[in-house]
Regions:
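Short loop segments and helix-boundary regions at transmembrane helix junctions
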Residues: 9-20, 83-92, 113-184, 219-224, ...
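Hydrophobic core segments of alpha-helical transmembrane domains in multi-pass membrane transport
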Residues: 22-37, 75-80, 100-106, 127-131, ...
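Transmembrane helix-bundle core of multi-pass membrane transporters
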Residues: 59, 153, 157-222, 275-276, ...
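Helix-loop-helix "hairpin" substructures at the membrane interface of multi-pass membrane proteins
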Residues: 133, 199-276, 300-305, 371
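Transmembrane alpha-helical segments in multi-pass inner-membrane proteins
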Residues: 255, 261, 265-335
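Single transmembrane alpha-helix segments in multi-pass membrane proteins
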Residues: 35-40, 50, 55-110, 124-150, ...
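Membrane-interfacial amphipathic/re-entrant helices at transmembrane-helix boundaries
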Residues: 2-75, 117-118, 122
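Cytosolic-side transmembrane-helix boundaries in multi-pass membrane proteins
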Residues: 1-28, 34-38, 234, 241-248, ...
Length: 371
């Protein structure tokens, strides 16, 4: 007689388990990626060694890894904030783009005459406002009309991308560089609006991103308002019974999530890109932020090292092409990491066991004693 597996809630998972599962998820993804590379005729150890050297083997490699990680920290925070409330904001990509649009727009409007101490904060704040405004397009219907935020935020990504392309390729907007006539490109923002660099093209955006992630962690984990948010995320019915205004909390967190992604767009424009350039901004950083949040277990501080890991993977793409390995290998690894991270989250929340065997009782005929 076959015994069916029993899936039961684990309860509160230990800190060791929460650390071990993401590590094992990454290792499992590397094993699967290694099998794929071996099938295609590549030596997995050589490929992974090249990736590691490209990401951390030189000063330029470390700088490029941290540059790639900067927006991922904030798009990871954006996803983690929303998902903690069981709000499925899949629109980080569109909010990132609209943050870049708002940030570059305010930089161009202020012009080179504005001092850096005015221009840089204005650019960053404008990026957050842009992301929040774009998130509100999905947040308000979700809260007050009960619409499905997965569909609306996903569709808004493509609208934001088309809007950015229109500003540069399909119009004579202020965002388009009038000095370039051969192929349209974004107007460079003034130097006074750019983030100061301090190491091999690496700018202070990495510190701003880390500070914002820590601030989000403190807000959610250490304040009375954050406690109410966590209650809503655990049980909306319990929160309503306790007198918490659930709809208001969901709306605010949704807007904060969009603002975090918008900050990422602002830092990318004011940092390595320096303009609203669709070719440099359409990188799927909002979608990668979902992987970062999932692998971090929605922990807002764990997002930081995970974003650096993903930045290292992104940075390794060009290095792989130099040895004949397709750069799509990086995308495959990111997808494998996401799959194993989601599976790992299941095992954090649940345990699987076999049912216990019940003793079999045998009735003996009258007058017959068991041997």
């Amino acid at each position: 007689m076959t015994r069916r597996l029993i899936v039961e809630p684990r309860g509160l998972a230990s800190a060791r388990l929460r650390i071990l599962v993401p590590v094992l998820s990454v290792l499992a993804a590397l094993v699967v990626g290694g099998l794929f590379l071996a099938i295609t005729g590549e030596n997995p150890l050589d490929v992974y060694g090249k990736m590691l050297d490209a990401a951390f083997g030189s000063a330029n490699g470390v700088s490029n890894t941290l540059i790639s990680a900067t927006p991922l920290i904030l798009t990871g925070v954006a996803a983690a904030l929303a998902f903690k409330m069981l709000v499925w904001n899949i629109g980080g990509e569109g909010q990132f783009i609209m943050g870049a649009v708002f940030a570059s727009g305010i930089a161009i409007w202020l012009g080179p005459g504005a001092p850096s101490w005015v221009a840089i904060p204005a650019v960053i704040v404008a990026g957050g406002v842009g992301g929040a405004v774009w998130a509100s397009v999905a947040a308000v219907p979700r809260v007050y009309l009960g619409t499905n935020e997965i569909i609306t935020t996903l569709m808004l990504n493509f609208i934001a991308l088309s809007f950015m392309n229109f500003l540069i390729f399909g119009s004579s907007s202020p965002w388009r560089d009038p000095a370039v006539s051969t192929f349209p490109s974004g107007r460079p923002i003034p130097d006074t609006a750019k983030l100061p660099e301090f190491f091999k093209r690496l700018d202070i955006g990495i510190f701003i991103a880390i500070a914002l992630a820590v601030a989000a962690w403190w807000l959610i984990g250490k304040t009375r308002w954050g406690f109410a948010v966590r209650v809503v995320g655990d049980s909306a019915a319990t929160a309503r019974y306790a007198g918490i205004r659930v709809s208001k909390k969901i709306l605010v967190v949704f807007l904060l999530s969009g603002a975090a992604a918008g900050f990422a767009g602002a830092l990318y424009v004011a940092g390595p890109v320096g303009a609203l350039d669709p070719r440099s901004l359409d990188l799927g950083l909002g979608f990668t932020g979902i992987i970062v949040a999932a692998l971090a277990g929605l922990h807002l501080l764990a997002v930081i090292p995970i974003a650096i890991l993903m930045g290292a993977l992104n940075n390794a793409g060009p290095a792989l092409q130099s040895i004949g390995v397709p750069a799509a290998t990086v995308t495959m690894l990111q997808g494998a990491i996401l799959i194993f991270a989601v599976a790992g989250e299941f095992f954090i929340r649940h345990r699987i066991r076999l049912p216990r065997r019940e003793p079999v009782s045998v009735e003996m005929p009258d007058g017959v004693e068991p041997a």
